[in-house]
UniProtKB/Swiss-Prot annotation:
GO terms for biological process: negative regulation of translation; translation. Belongs to the universal ribosomal protein uL13 family. This is Large ribosomal subunit protein uL13. It comes from the Bacteria. HAMAP family: Ribosomal_uL13. Keywords: Ribonucleoprotein, Ribosomal protein. GO terms for molecular function: mRNA binding; structural constituent of ribosome. Part of the 50S ribosomal subunit. InterPro entries: Ribosomal_uL13, Ribosomal_uL13_bac-type, Ribosomal_uL13_CS, Ribosomal_uL13_sf. This protein is one of the early assembly proteins of the 50S ribosomal subunit, although it is not seen to bind rRNA by itself. It is important during the early stages of 50S assembly. GO terms for cellular component: cytosolic large ribosomal subunit.
Amino acid sequence: MKTFTAKLENIRRNWYIMDASNKILGRFASNIALRLRGKHKVIYTPHIDTGDYIIVLNAKKITVTGNKLSDKKYYHYTGFVGGIKEQNLKDLMTKRPEYVIERAVKGMLPKGALGKAMLKKLKVYAGTEHQHAAQQPQVLEI
């Protein structure tokens, strides 16, 4: 018996909608990462992108446990001397709630070109409106 390897021309990608309302950030992000990688499919192959497209709605309503709203810090470097900036989760959720979910999922995907291709299939929106009705996405309850 030979080992099965998925081929790009045989992969069917589905579109799913996930609602982030009252979901815990880490658990929600790990479920998204699993589906973006395609690990829920029988044809999963580690070096080929077999995952589906995920649309996340209501990113501004996601929750975290404990004191993470005030304690969790997000850092970025501007490129200048002394230019490291920090922002806590509460401030980031008011300005860019989509980024919080994207960053959590990005950390759970492979690093490199394959992970970047997987992350492009993630579409995150702060509210309930999205522009992917033509793809006829299915609602995915978790």
